[in-house]
UniProtKB/Swiss-Prot annotation:
Subcellular location: Cytoplasm
GO biological process, one term: protein unfolding
Keyword ATP-binding: yes
Subunit structure: A double ring-shaped homohexamer of HslV is capped on each side by a ring-shaped HslU homohexamer. The assembly of the HslU/HslV complex is dependent on binding of ATP.
Binding site for ATP: 19, 61-66, 277, 341, 413
Gene3D superfamilies, alphabetized: 1.10.8.60, P-loop containing nucleotide triphosphate hydrolases
Species classification: Bacteria, Bacillati, Bacillota, Bacilli, Bacillales
GO-annotated cellular components: HslUV protease complex
The name this protein goes by in its record: ATP-dependent protease ATPase subunit HslU
Protein's job: ATPase subunit of a proteasome-like degradation complex; this subunit has chaperone activity. The binding of ATP and its subsequent hydrolysis by HslU are essential for unfolding of protein substrates subsequently hydrolyzed by HslV. HslU recognizes the N-terminal part of its protein substrates and unfolds these before they are guided to HslV for hydrolysis.
SUPFAM superfamilies: P-loop containing nucleoside triphosphate hydrolases
MF GO annotations: ATP binding; ATP hydrolysis activity; peptidase activity; proteasome-activating activity
Chief location of this protein within or outside the cell: cytoplasm
């Protein structure tokens, strides 16, 4: 599965969600297009061409993670975000770096499985409906008690068996009627008893998350749960709920997990994107103290980025063609502080700019998922048509920029805290007030946020 989008189209798609940062968008668009170009080459040349990994440099909240995440969604590529600070050098307490590849494969399996389930959705629903009819019209089987073996072998059909045949015919007619009612949606609220498989918990939870288990690439909990017999539990639920449970069970039976696993590994190897955040936190110059461990983390990451084979519970995974995007603010350190070998593995460097007032204005109104649109939609559920005036939007953007400059610069995330504070009273009272339309004006913004923004000490705690 490879995207046929051109770099220009990729940038246009990213523009729907992310404001500015054209340099970063162009770099990731070219990296993605090169993957498509690589698939068109003959196998010998294809193996030689590896992705050009990207290093994004810029403060928090300017769109580094969002660019990578949206890029992965565009092409249905497996994507994970990890933080470099969570890893430690081999021998220290903490996650080993190979776990990022295992997490990527898990993400890939989940992605492929969801796609396969979607393909068999209609068939699974039909099978679920058949099972529902069986639950709604249970069989009328009668046990015949024989006095001796000869009676069982040589007994003739009697009147009771003829009656059973009539009952079976009546039951078939009833099933047809029930099927029709089920199709019309007349039985959705009726209650049925469904037998569901119960998850095995208990002592197996002890095996979760052990660093040693991660290094073995094995999931002990899953292994033990497969050894334990599956428990069945009866649950009463409505037909509507039961259809969902039964359809899920039937879908699991219809998909071939071996095929899913194989496809997931291929997709992780060829299309996978690993986003390593806070890479600057493991960069250090000195050879003493914590920096020794930091350099150890870099040296452990190096073979993964260079290309190696990692053993996972689904099989061996090669990392040669996985795209790595590293990101960091680099306030205290510089990219040159990374070990030279790792620097060489991230040939494309992109600097993301801090956000200006105009950027904040665009972020508030332009993207498809803009914050103002989200809050307007939320209050619409209470019957209130809320709108932000252009002056109010610019005022919010100005305050966000000022607070970022005076306190910690957290980029666009500042808008979340500002809008939450701005609409706090309105969100609380919305269910009780009767307003059809409401406009958020510049004066209202000044009244709610002006004093906090001006008071530097207070803004550090509230905003």
């Amino acid at each position: 599965m490879t995207s046929t989008l051109t770099p220009r189209e990729i940038v246009e798609r990213l523009n729907q969600y992310i404001v500015g940062q054209d340099g970063a968008k162009r770099s990731v668009a070219v990296a993605l297009r090169n993957r498509y170009r690589r698939t068109k080459l003959d196998p010998s040349m294809r193996e030689e061409i590896t992705p050009k990994n990207i290093l994004m440099i810029g403060p928090t909240g300017v769109g580094k993670t969002e660019i990578a995440r949206r890029l992965a969604k565009l092409v249905g590529a497996p994507f994970i975000k990890v933080e470099a600070t969570k890893f430690t050098e081999v021998g220290y307490v903490g996650r080993d770096v190979e776990s990022m590849v295992r997490d990527l494969v898990e993400s890939s399996v989940r992605l492929v499985k969801e796609e396969r389930v979607a393909l068999v959705k209609d068939e699974a629903k039909q099978l679920a409906d058949k099972r529902l009819i069986e639950l709604l019209v249970p069989s009328m089987k009668k046990e015949t008690n024989y006095k001796n073996p000869f009676e069982m072998l040589f007994s003739q059909p009697d009147k009771e068996e003829e009656e059973d045949g009539e009952e079976e015919l009546t039951r078939a007619n009833l099933k047809r009627k029930m099927a029709e009612k089920l199709k019309q949606g007349e039985l959705e609220e009726r209650t049925v008893t469904v037998e569901v498989t119960e998850q095995n918990h208990g002592f197996m939870d002890l095996f979760q998350g052990g660093a040693g288990m991660e290094q073995m690439g094995m999931n002990m909990q899953e292994m033990l749960s497969n050894m334990m017999p599956k428990k069945k539990k009866k649950r009463r639920m409505t037909v509507a709920e039961a259809r969902g449970v039964l359809a899920e069970e039937e879908a699991q039976k219809l998909i071939d997990m071996d095929d899913v696993t194989q496809e997931a590994i291929t997709r992780a190897e060829q299309l996978g994107i690993i986003f390593i955040d806070e890479i600057d936190k493991v960069a250090g110059k000195n050879d003493q103290g914590a920096n020794v461990s930091r350099e150890g983390v870099q040296r452990d990451i190096l073979p993964i980025v260079e290309g190696s084979t990692v053993v996972t519970k689904y099989g061996a995974v090669k990392t040669d063609h996985i795209l790595f995007i590293a990101a960091g603010a680099f306030h205290m350190a510089k990219p040159a502080d990374l070990i030279p070998e790792l620097q060489g593995r991230f040939p494309i460097r992109v600097e993301l700019q801090s956000l200006s007032v105009d950027d904040f204005v665009r972020i508030l109104v332009e993207p498809d998922n803009a914050l103002t649109k989200q809050y307007e939609a939320l209050l619409q559920t209470e019957g209130i048509e809320m709108k932000f005036s252009d002056e109010a939007v610019r005022k919010i953007a100005t305050i966000a920029s000022e607070v970022n400059q005076e306190t910690e610069n957290i980029g666009a995330r500042r808008l979340h805290t500002l809008l939450e504070k701005l609409l706090e009273d309105l969100s609380f009272e919305a269910a009780d007030i009767h307003l059809e339309t409401l406009e958020i004006t510049e004066q209202y913004v000044e009244e709610k946020l002006g004093s906090i923004a001006k008071n530097r000490d207070l803004s550090q705690f509230i905003l």
